[in-house]
């Protein structure tokens, strides 16, 4: 009786009841079941780097972890890492940041992406969110009680937003404009001229510009992505999120950062003071070492990613699928041949070929018609996956 009563009484808050299950969690369960039955599944879906960080980063963590004083909370004790972030931005982008007021550490950048909406949006306020995009931009706004106005990212515009097409009614309610370049999932890039226009647009319409920049150090053929903070006056209207996950092969370590507008940085810091107890000191030591240490190894790491990209694209092109090779990030954004929806297309592909890719519609309605291939895995495995995909599409008469 008590159990039945408890079940009847416990109901989720409305803000949580609207949340759908995370796509990759459900996909992971399906793949585990297939592997349990002996399937040789090739994962080309989630963008989790498979390469380890170099030894000097690991050694910094081990050294810190061996000290008795590092096994405690680090609240108020992360200034060393914030100094390292500022030093990285100065050296990498030529951007001067005050590490005391314009920088804060995050338990992974995803935490900050979510928290930003919580500290800025009141019920009825709006966030301008690219479509397709990383789901946390929209979900953070919705959980905060805000509304989401989607901005289409179209191939004809090189997957850049058309600011002039945003309705005035949406602009009047909007407080945040999200950007992400190099882009997930499309692999598109943006130059400083675009960022200058974005800063001017944000200033004109009293918006906070939020730029998610975790792929800035994953580039091909010598490409190096800029930072929004390089635009003069950007700190007046913008913040930028970054992470050690993709740059330093430290996905899962959960160490990120936000830099820029001092007032917004303070809002996030205040929220976090009630939410968490900061990052484990040995992880901070490793991240600090990564950002201040030798960066030359990134060239070889990017060469590996580029070779993977070229291998997959070559196989797809040989089969007749026109997938554009990206200049940055970890993804190939490929068109779904035929009229099948991307969700059904990828589900059928997994069932028939044991190759897992991501349906474009997972990233938004304007992702329909595409599927995303992640370049995380050994080159030969990725080549094998691309071959299975190509043969499967040919057998179905799609290419």
Language-model features: locations:
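N-terminal small-domain helix-loop-helix segment of the aminotransferase-like
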Residues: 10-108, 115, 291-293, 393-399
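Conserved glycine-rich beta-strand-loop-beta hairpin in the small C-terminal domain of fold type I
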Residues: 288, 304-313, 323-335, 367
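PLP-dependent enzyme catalytic core of the Aspartate aminotransferase-like
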Residues: 4-5, 339, 348-358, 363-399
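Conserved core segment of the aminotransferase class I/II
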Residues: 6, 230-231, 235-303, 310, ...
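Conserved PLP-anchoring active-site segment centered on the Schiff-base-forming lysine
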Residues: 119-141
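Active-site phosphate-binding strand-loop segment of PLP-dependent enzymes
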Residues: 149, 153-222
């Amino acid at each position: 009786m008590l159990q039945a009563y408890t079940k009847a009484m416990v109901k989720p808050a409305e803000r949580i009841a609207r949340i759908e299950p995370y796509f990759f969690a459900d996909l992971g369960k399906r793949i585990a079941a297939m592997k349990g039955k002996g399937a040789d599944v090739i994962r080309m879906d989630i963008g989790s780097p498979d390469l380890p960080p170099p030894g000097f980063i690991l050694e910094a963590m081990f050294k810190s972890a061996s000290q008795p004083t590092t096994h405690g909370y680090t609240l108020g004790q992360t200034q060393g890492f914030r100094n390292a972030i500022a030093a990285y931005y100065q050296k990498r982008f030529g951007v001067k940041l005050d590490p005391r007021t314009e920088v804060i550490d995050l338990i992974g950048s995803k935490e900050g992406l979510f928290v930003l909406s919580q500290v800025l949006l009141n019920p009825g306020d709006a966030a301008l969110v690219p479509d397709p995009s990383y789901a946390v931009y929209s979900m953070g706004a919705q959980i905060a009680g805000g509304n989401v106005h989607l901005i289409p990212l179209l191939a004809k515009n090189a997957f850049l937003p058309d600011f002039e097409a945003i309705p005035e009614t949406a602009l009047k309610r909007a407080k945040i404009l999200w950007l992400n370049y190099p882009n997930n999932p499309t692999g598109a890039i943006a130059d400083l001229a675009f960022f200058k226009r974005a800063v001017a647009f944000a200033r004109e319409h009293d918006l906070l510009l939020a730029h998610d920049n975790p792929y800035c150090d994953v580039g091909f053929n010598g490409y190096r992505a800029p930072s929004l903070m390089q635009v003069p006056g950007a700190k007046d209207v913008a913040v930028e999120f970054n992470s050690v996950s993709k740059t330093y092969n430290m996905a899962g370590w959960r160490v990120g950062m936000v830099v820029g507008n001092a007032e917004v940085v303070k809002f996030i810091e205040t929220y976090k003071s009630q939410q968490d107890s900061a990052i484990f000191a040995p992880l901070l030591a490793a991240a600090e070492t990564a950002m201040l240490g030798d960066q030359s190894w990134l060239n070889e790491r990017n060469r590996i990613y580029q070779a993977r990209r070229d291998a997959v694209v070559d196989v797809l092109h040989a089969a007749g699928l026109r997938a554009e090779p990206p200049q940055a990030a970890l993804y190939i954004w490929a068109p779904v041949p035929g009229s099948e929806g991307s969700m059904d297309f990828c589900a059928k592909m997994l069932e028939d070929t044991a190759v897992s890719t991501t349906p474009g519609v997972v990233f938004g309605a304007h992702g329909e018609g595409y599927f995303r291939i992640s370049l995380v895995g050994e080159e030969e495995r990725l080549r094998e996956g691309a071959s299975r995909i190509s043969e499967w599409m040919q057998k179905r008469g799609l290419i």
